[in-house]
Amino acid sequence: MTELFYDDDADLSIIQGRTVAVIGYGSQGHAHALSLRDSGVDVRVGLAEGSQSRAKAEAEGLRVLNVAEAVAEADVIMVLTPDQVQRHVYAESIAANLQAGDALFFGHGFNIRYGYIQPPADVDVALVAPKGPGHIVRREFEAGRGVPDLIAVEQDPSGNAWALALSYAKAIGGTRAGVIKTTFTEETETDLFGEQAVLCGGASQLIQYGFETLTEAGYKPEVAYFEVLHELKLIVDLMVEGGIAKQRWSVSDTAEYGDYVSGPLVIDAHVKDNMKAVLKDIQDGTFAKRFIDDQDAGAPEFKALRAKGEQHPIETTGRELRKLFSWIQNDDDYTEGSVAR
């Protein structure tokens, strides 16, 4: 049975009595650090020398150190750098500065699940993973609400890791919404599967094939874009609000009937078989090895796939159409048409 925890189940004073280092200041890093600070926690940010995020963190009133210094000062270390660099950051700046009784926290279980990071046995190892992007985590915290978190404990030599993880989750707003107990393995494997088979890989490929099908049949690219990409948000928002049932309740009878009779023609049984193959590669480490090996080689496959995706005709059409969308807010960190970060 799924275990859920809320504010009354967590003691904020536990994390308030610790010294926290947040390593990284990206999407999740800024949300964690700022919310911890606002919850009365002694927090500092650890960044690599020359990091472009230093000025942003300092401008928001946070104390910034290099990673080794931040870890040496802290007894709770939350690692929020990208998966592919975590093991390097750990080896170069974290491992030598860990002390017995410290707690090593992660926002995603990848490096623990696949053994790229192997902490010493006298250190607590836990996971606190908000189920939303950092700007939403921070926005909801400031509004007095929260985003649900997943929490897990891999090592608990202190006997206090669960209580500490719950306290940390409370400090970033997670227990306001609800915290679900899981494992590093379950969080990592389901997260990767969701990204690859449905949310990112599956959805992106479905949209591109839909666009190609319509334009190859002679329909205008602009009309195809609206029908297979732009309106997707409307459908997903309904699903988020009330599941697939509310989406079907909200659309026309024609759309609902088409959902039932045509959906299984497009997403048929062989797609589920393909999903099982994707899951197997995640479970046995094939995907993780492919990703890390490519990153270690300079990411040639990753860069080639990214460039290919950017060149798809739907991107050209979308760039022109979005100029008409007065309601879209520009993101200062994003360059239109580019996936590179």
Curated annotation (Swiss-Prot):
Residues annotated for Mg(2+) 1 binding in this entry: 191, 195
Residues covered by the KARI N-terminal Rossmann domain:
1-182
Transmembrane regions: none
- SUPFAM superfamilies in UniProt: 6-phosphogluconate dehydrogenase C-terminal domain-like, NAD(P)-binding Rossmann-fold domains
Which cofactors does it use?
A: Mg(2+)
Q: Which residues bind substrate?
A: 252
Report which reactions are catalysed by this protein: (2R)-2,3-dihydroxy-3-methylbutanoate + NADP(+) = (2S)-2-acetolactate + NADPH + H(+); (2R,3R)-2,3-dihydroxy-3-methylpentanoate + NADP(+) = (S)-2-ethyl-2-hydroxy-3-oxobutanoate + NADPH + H(+)
Q: Which residues bind NADP(+)?
A: 25-28, 51, 53, 83-86, 134
What Pfam families does the database record attribute to this sequence? KARI_C, KARI_N
- Physiological role: Involved in the biosynthesis of branched-chain amino acids (BCAA). Catalyzes an alkyl-migration followed by a ketol-acid reduction of (S)-2-acetolactate (S2AL) to yield (R)-2,3-dihydroxy-isovalerate. In the isomerase reaction, S2AL is rearranged via a Mg-dependent methyl migration to produce 3-hydroxy-3-methyl-2-ketobutyrate (HMKB). In the reductase reaction, this 2-ketoacid undergoes a metal-dependent reduction by NADPH to yield (R)-2,3-dihydroxy-isovalerate.
Q: Which organism is it from?
A: Renibacterium salmoninarum (strain ATCC 33209 / DSM 20767 / JCM 11484 / NBRC 15589 / NCIMB 2235)
Name any one GO molecular function: ketol-acid reductoisomerase activity
Q: Which family does it belong to?
A: Belongs to the ketol-acid reductoisomerase family.
Keywords for this entry?
A: Amino-acid biosynthesis, Branched-chain amino acid biosynthesis, Magnesium, Metal-binding, NADP, Oxidoreductase
UniProt-annotated catalytic positions: 108
State the protein's name.
Answer: Ketol-acid reductoisomerase (NADP(+))
Instruction: Tell me its EC number(s), please.
Output: 1.1.1.86
Q: How is the cofactor bound?
A: Binds 2 magnesium ions per subunit.
Give GO terms for biological process. Answer: isoleucine biosynthetic process; L-valine biosynthetic process
GO cellular component, alphabetical, reads: cytosol
| Pathway stated in the Swiss-Prot or TrEMBL entry | Amino-acid biosynthesis; L-isoleucine biosynthesis; L-isoleucine from 2-oxobutanoate: step 2/4; Amino-acid biosynthesis; L-valine biosynthesis; L-valine from pyruvate: step 2/4
PANTHER family, sorted: KETOL-ACID REDUCTOISOMERASE, MITOCHONDRIAL
The residues that the entry says bind Mg(2+) 2 are: 191, 227, 231
